[in-house]
Amino acid sequence: RLGGLRPGQSLAVDPLTAATLFESQVASRLLDHTARWLRADGHGYYTIGSAGHESNAAVALALRPSDPALLHYRSGGFYVARASQVAGHDAVGDVLRGMLARTTDPISGGRHKVFGHRALNVIPQTSTIASHLPRAVGLAQWGARDAGRGDVVVCSFGDASLNHSTAQGALNWAQHTAHRGDPVPVLFVCEDNGLGISVPSPEGWVADRVGRMGMEVESVEGDDPAEVLAATSRLSGHVREQRRPALLHLCCVRYLGHAGSDAEAAYRTTSDVRADYERDPIVGAGRLLVDAGECAGTDLVEWYLSQRVEIRERALALLSEPEFESATQVMAPLAAPDEARVATHATAFHGSGRGGSLE
């Protein structure tokens, strides 16, 4: 579909932003395909991807790189786009190392493929459903004490997670805090692909539920990147200025099933799967570039294929980096803290005048 794009009338996004968005989305999609390619050859350990959710890259570009992010596990697009805002950061290398469980993985040391990096202000999450929402609310309250920073905490999650008691408790906490008049600058992003692994969300459920939450809410289609950028800008501006929570309902699709082992054909019809390909966020981003006269659809296809080769070559090169050799290495961070190490870290954090003693 990229190759068939022709110039249109949509010039709502400047060419540089459109190019960054497209590049971030493509990198994320190709990382997902690379994960399956590696697994088929006996390499790599993680195949849950972000394909179809890449519109979250537009959410990242509409925020500041200093805004703390606690992300859904399908947030590859966001992670790559956030890295594009920080000079010299290698998001593709980060994700590949996690995928391959290399000890050089910068966030988990090869223990789990998870989105996170201190330099990007992306806080890593566990795989426990909705467990990061309370953390996001708490972080927003804590950060709001420094009114001069004006940070917005962004927290993304899936439509099925919305039904989890942990999510409901966190959303209620945010609303309750705002109702008291206390600042809680958090932007929730519900990435709604209509499926909780193999269980479909009832049609209209998410829209109805978030519409009753008593906070500022906007709903956008993920294959309309100009509107995702605009809606995120509006909502983040509201949160930043009013110090109150808001929610972006991001309607998207899911490609490649839940994970590599998922037999999607067992619970979805062929026509449903095909219909999703009419809502591809990458085609939406590519349309922005073609409409701006920056390139033709065939140019985008050629570039996409060249990037596929490059990312696969990088993945193969990373196979030479070290893996864990023992369970002891894997569990090392769980070991009881050594008193001398604790004292050293405390001194380094607080300075020589504080925290240097455990007495």
Positions of PLM-derived features:
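Glycine/aspartate-rich loop-and-adjacent alpha/beta segment that forms the canonical ThDP
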Residues: 4, 238-359
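Glycine-rich, charged/polar anion/phosphate-binding loops
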Residues: 170-174, 230-237
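Catalytic or ion-translocation cores adjacent to nucleophile or general acid/base/metal-coordination motifs
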Residues: 182, 187-192
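Cofactor-binding active-site loop characterized by glycine-rich and histidine/acidic residues
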Residues: 30-33, 40-184, 197-207, 211-214
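Conserved thiamine diphosphate
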Residues: 147-149, 202-234, 278-305
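Hydrophobic alpha-helical scaffolding
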Residues: 11, 46-49, 128, 160, ...
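Cofactor-/ligand-binding subdomain signature composed of acidic, glycine-rich
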Residues: 1-44, 288-291
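Structured core elements
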Residues: 47, 70, 187-189, 219, ...
